[in-house]
């Protein structure tokens, strides 16, 4: 009974944490960073990068529009895209990929400018973790990431997606990709697998590190700053309960390594061909 009470307290902390630190005065701001351009094997032009939430409120509907120009200064096209995450917490960065899918236009691009639009949104519950991530390269030179997403929320997680932002040696973004867990719905206190691929050696060979973020209709990834607080809260609650039940000879274990999950996986990969 007491153990269930502790677990309930921890779950409530996770749910209300986004609201505990809401600022008194809202600052709505964001910036584009770490962008690079490339032309893929199909002849399509891309600009990939991140949008960093530099304000103190959540953002949504984050749209990046590009103005493409030829060498003579004439305008070619106005492609646009949204970040792969629908909701962005303060201090977080979300990847984007703006693509020009007309080969003739792509070949004529000499310069570009980017415009950023966004709106304030309400906080989203932190409840999802990507973990046990394994990286391999297939026979085509593609990077293949496999792992699991854990649902630590208070209800099922629908339309669960994993967003990968991949960086080169200079720290700039070289690829952004997205996949869904299989299946996309994760029941309460359960996990589902995912697989995310960086296709082809032309992009994969540039990758030196990456980050993974998870989002669903109900939840988003547990951020790094919150994880230590959760662990501290769990440890404190367990210590109190352990003291109270010590007279009857019962103790409660500390959280396992599996429970100490973090939002972001950001490593230098070491690949083994499959």
Go through each PLM region and give its residues.
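Secretory targeting signatures
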Residues: 1-28, 220-274
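Short, solvent-exposed loop/turn segments enriched in Ser/Thr/Gly
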Residues: 42-48, 141-146
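Intrinsically disordered, low-complexity Pro/Gly/Ser/Thr-rich segments with frequent PxxP/GP/PP motifs
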Residues: 76-105, 174-203
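Terminal connector regions
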Residues: 85, 100-142, 176, 199-222
């Amino acid at each position: 009974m007491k153990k269930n009470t502790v677990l309930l307290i921890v779950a409530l902390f996770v749910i209300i944490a986004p609201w505990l630190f809401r600022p008194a005065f809202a600052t709505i701001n964001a910036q584009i960073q770490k962008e690079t351009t490339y032309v893929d094997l199909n002849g399509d032009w891309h600009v990939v990068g991140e949008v960093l939430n530099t304000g103190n409120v959540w953002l949504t509907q984050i749209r990046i529009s590009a103005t493409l120009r030829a060498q003579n200064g004439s305008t070619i096209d106005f492609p646009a895209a949204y970040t792969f995450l629908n909701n962005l917490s303060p201090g977080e960065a979300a990847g984007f990929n703006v693509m020009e899918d007309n080969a003739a236009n792509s070949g004529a691009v000499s310069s570009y400018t980017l415009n950023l639009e966004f709106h304030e949104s309400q906080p989203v519950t932190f409840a999802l973790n990507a973990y046990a991530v394994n990286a391999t390269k297939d026979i085509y030179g593609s990077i293949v990431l496999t792992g699991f997403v854990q649902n630590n929320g208070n209800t099922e997680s629908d339309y669960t997606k994993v967003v990968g932002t991949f960086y080169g040696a200079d720290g700039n973004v070289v690829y952004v990709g997205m996949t869904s867990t299989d299946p996309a719905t994760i029941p309460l206190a359960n996990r589902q697998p995912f697989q995310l691929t960086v296709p082809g050696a032309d992009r994969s060979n540039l990758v030196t590190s990456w980050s993974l973020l998870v989002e669903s209709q109900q939840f988003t990834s547990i951020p790094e700053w919150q994880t230590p607080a959760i662990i501290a809260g769990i440890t404190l609650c367990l210590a109190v309960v352990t003291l109270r039940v010590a007279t009857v000879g019962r103790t409660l274990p500390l959280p396992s390594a599996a429970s100490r999950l973090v939002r972001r996986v950001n490593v230098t990969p070491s690949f083994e061909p499959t």
